[in-house]
Every structure is written in C-alpha cells, then in structure tokens.
Amino acid sequence: MDAIREAIRIERLSKTFSNGRKALDEIDLRIEPGEMVALIGASGSGKSTLLRHIAGFTASDAQPSQIEILGRPIQQNGRIVREVRSIRRDIGFVFQQFNLVNRLSVETNVLIGALARLPWWRRLSGRFPRAERALSIAALNEVGIGEHARERAANLSGGQQQRAALARALVQRARIVLADEPIASLDPESSRRVMDMLRTLNIEHRLTVLVSLHQVEIAMQYCPRTIALRRGKVVYDGPSAALTPALLKTLYGDEARELIDEAAQGPDDTESKNTADNTPLQDAAPASGRYAFALNPAHSN
C-alpha cells in the first residue's frame, strides 16, 4: 500500500452562511503527516469554521470541493460522507470549550477516547477494560495531571482541562489533532504547558497538529509553518519565522493590530474554568523546512 502523502487535503472549499456572508472562499490546502501548523487570523477570519469543516461537523457549499483525511474523503461537494464517524476516529479535538463532561471523572473523560474500539455493551455500561484504564492513567501522567484522575472534570482549571483533552487524544490513538484556540483565556504558564504538550504529541508521538491561534508569537515559537486567513481567504502560507510586524501589516492592514497586540501582550492573566457539560491560502507548502513561500498577491498591496 502506498504511503499517505497528506494528512489533510482540501480542494476548493467554500462556505456561505445564511446571511450571505462568505466565511470560507476557495480554500486549497495540503498538510503532510507529522507537521505542526498554526492557523492565524483576526476574529471572524474563518479559523474555527475551517476546522469544523475539516472535522466533518459542518458541510461546505454545494459546489465541487473535497476534504480528505489521511487519504479518505470526509466531505465532497457540500455533503459529509456516511463514513464520517469512522474517519473521525483518527482525529483528536481540542476546543476552547474544553469538551469535557463536568459531572464525570477526569479518567472517564479521557477513556471516552477509547469508546470507538470497544464492544457496544461496554459502551453502554461504561465498563472499560483494565488495559484501557491503564492507558488512560498513563496518558494523564504524560500530560502532567495524573493526580487528578479521580476528580470531577468540573474541578479542573482551564489549562488542566485542555491537557485532559490532549490525554483523551492519546487514548483515542488519534493521528491528527485539531486544536481551536486551545490557549484562549489561559494564563501564560497554563498556555505554555498546553502548547508544550501539543509539541510533544507532534514530535514524540508523531501526530499531525493543526492549531488555531490569535498570538503570532506563539505560532512562531511552536509551529514551523503558519497559514494565515483573512476574511475566509488564505493570504499567507509559509515559514512562521517570516511573520514580521511589517508582513502582518501588509497582509491584514489595520486588522494586524489584533494579532500584533495580542502577540505583545500574551494570553489573559486569568485562567478560565469550564461550566458547561455540552460540546460545543493558497496551496500549502511542504513540511520539514522545504517551504514554497506563498503570499497571495491579492493581499500584498
């Protein structure tokens, strides 16, 4: 069997909301296995919408388009495929809302990552095999919160909840992690720990990571490659190190202040806690430093 060349492949993806606003406009992307890529943009640029399409949570416009995950289509021409759940088994999700069930223990939340490979009766009864429980404790220890395994998820801080979500991705045996603003509202130390753990998943576990961020300096520190969105279009795809304030001004105009100011200030100083139980460019450059610098000329004036 041929090796999978792309972890994520997107062709001609567009999304128009019911109010007529174009949220995504002809997106074409290639992300190779093992890359750690930042997705940046001002508020309303389309970052979260793009991630939801990649995950198969939202269907695109009904026009020729495709999103593939590890060589398998997850949606085509505005329709999500029937096999979407099996494809999602390879994707770990980390969102701003933390996506944990507050009333359950931290360990049980992490074990949810194993449900897809368990018999139906174990799913219904919540009786997890000893091997899966051992795996969940090992994952919690790896992300640094093993001592909280028996606590209710509601008792964790925001940063700890994000790390629990990363532990769940390990138990799930995901191959791709989609992280939507995972350090929003976290204090600097919690933000560092979450980003360090994402990098560990990428380097040591060889997971492909696509993480949306507001803080350009965080993207430059952790992600070799950055994709920049503006008003639903890819305006930059290339080395993160090249994202100088001058280039951001060229790409975003006055909107660059949002990205530059947040980069200078860092995350908020107050770490939030979750109180809800419910869930919620142009052609990409190659990985591993072999970038084909891509600046959309339509946004370079």
Curated annotation (Swiss-Prot):
Keyword ATP-binding found: yes
Gene3D superfamilies hit by this protein: P-loop containing nucleotide triphosphate hydrolases (3.40.50.300)
Keyword presence, Transport: yes
Enzyme class name: translocase
GO molecular function: ABC-type phosphonate transporter activity; ATP binding; ATP hydrolysis activity
Source organism: Paraburkholderia xenovorans (strain LB400)
Keywords: ATP-binding, Cell inner membrane, Cell membrane, Membrane, Nucleotide-binding, Phosphonate transport, Translocase, Transport
Primary site of residence: membrane
Assigned GO CC terms: plasma membrane
Segments of this protein annotated with the region Disordered: 264-287
Database matches in InterPro entries: AAA+_ATPase (IPR003593), ABC_transporter-like_ATP-bd (IPR003439), ABC_transporter-like_CS (IPR017871), ABC_transpr_PhnC (IPR012693), MetN_ABC_transporter-like (IPR050086), P-loop_NTPase (IPR027417)
Stretches assigned to the ABC transporter domain: 8-256
Sites where the protein binds ATP: 41-48
Catalytic activity: phosphonate(out) + ATP + H2O = phosphonate(in) + ADP + phosphate + H(+)
Family membership noted in the UniProt record: Belongs to the ABC transporter superfamily. Phosphonates importer (TC 3.A.1.9.1) family.
Compartments where found: Cell inner membrane
SMART domains, alphabetized: AAA
Subunit architecture: The complex is composed of two ATP-binding proteins (PhnC), two transmembrane proteins (PhnE) and a solute-binding protein (PhnD).
Annotated EC: 7.3.2.2
Short name of one Pfam family: ABC_tran
Topological type in the membrane: Peripheral membrane protein
Record's protein name: Phosphonates import ATP-binding protein PhnC
